[in-house]
């Protein structure tokens, strides 16, 4: 009979399957959201009177949001699968930042169309659900 090894990980799996599924769904949805929002910005700049400075600001924020989203999804997936609190907490902080940028594109953009609202509301809902599941997963990892 072998003695238990020191430092061996427990056999209990603590990573959250619903969180992992939501992260995958969020990554896919964000790719579509990014392309649709980019096309909507091009449409708005051609059809409507859209100030150049506001267009530059919106494009900059959209690309910043894309970078932030990629980092957030990486940390969230890594933290969940490795059952590590620090990357998951970093993803939670980035989720708040990404939700604020989503709210900007949903509410405070220079020109908000119904298509922007239809695209932004599910993204904001995904961020909210992910934040709740990340808090639950962090609590499970800590205890």
UniProtKB/Swiss-Prot annotation:
Name the chain's protein: Transmembrane protein 80
Please provide the Gene Ontology terms (biological process) for this protein: non-motile cilium assembly
Task: Output the Pfam families linked to this UniProt entry.
Answer: Transmemb_17
Subcellular compartments: Membrane; Cell projection, Cilium
Keyword Phosphoprotein on entry: no
User: Which cellular component terms (GO) are annotated to the entry?
Assistant: ciliary transition zone; membrane
The record's InterPro entries line, in alphabetical order, gives:
Uncharacterised_TM-17 (IPR019184)
PANTHER family (UniProt xref): GEO07735P1-RELATED-RELATED, TRANSMEMBRANE PROTEIN 80
Which keywords does this Swiss-Prot/TrEMBL entry list? Cell projection, Membrane, Transmembrane, Transmembrane helix
Among its keywords, does the record have Plastid?
A: no
Topology in membrane: Multi-pass membrane protein
Q: Provide the transmembrane region boundaries.
A: 22-42, 47-67, 88-108, 122-142
